């Protein structure tokens, strides 16, 4: 028996946030390029704004599909949490009131994505990356294999990388 995931066909990569829920939380969307996205609620309770290309995580102890760009909201103090996806749009969380306002966004969960590399790091094609701090990724170290967000497929040795996402669906 074949199993297929229900998904939304997107005409292009999403690049904006919604202040009203347009899809079911957790819905998958895909573009004709093969990139896949998941519809989530933005956690507006913290002080870390969302920006395209920044990793996001399921809020520790939060509601299903509520995500944050704040590493401390990911359930640890420092690295050690698996990414839920990559933000596709900017959200100024200070413009919203927690408990009153809701914001929704597609996050990228599969395909190739542009991310920001932590300064001073040299990542070459084929090497895996993990979240380093709010908004940047870093070269995966020994013992962090389970945290890999994907591997570099372009932009080696620069501050901007293209990675092939993995393990986020």
Q: What do the predicted segments below correspond to?
A:
Residues 1-169:
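Surface-exposed, low-hydrophobicity beta-strand/loop segments enriched in small/polar/acidic residues
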